[in-house]
């Protein structure tokens, strides 16, 4: 449901251009006094058992995370159940960024270790576009997209 994805709650490594990693309690839905009452709800294991090299994006009730063997997963934040999985050419690196398109829908931007950069519809998981900015056979993405207005 696109309405559930309307407002990014966390996108990118540091949440904002200053990389503050700060989110006010009202936006996060969690205050310091709540921390002692948190309970474990679910965990996600990857078949390779490898560590994850990406920062997840949290949008509405979904978590978008890249897998160590490739792929981007859209998970229900409350249950951990998958909405969809998008296949990538390689391991997803850097942060998954959210960008609001001109039509009002959210697009995820992510890069992989094989130097591909993807634009993915956040609701359906369908590929909107793909580019390889560097054609060198050893090229790889290890950073994250940044936005200035309509430029990435």
List the predicted regions and their residue ranges.
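Surface loop/turn motifs at the tips and blade-to-blade linkers of beta-strand repeat domains
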Residues: 44-48, 86-88, 132-136
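Repeat-blade elements of multi-bladed beta-propeller folds
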Residues: 7-17, 49-73, 90-117, 138-152
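Blade/loop signatures of beta-propeller domains
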Residues: 1-40
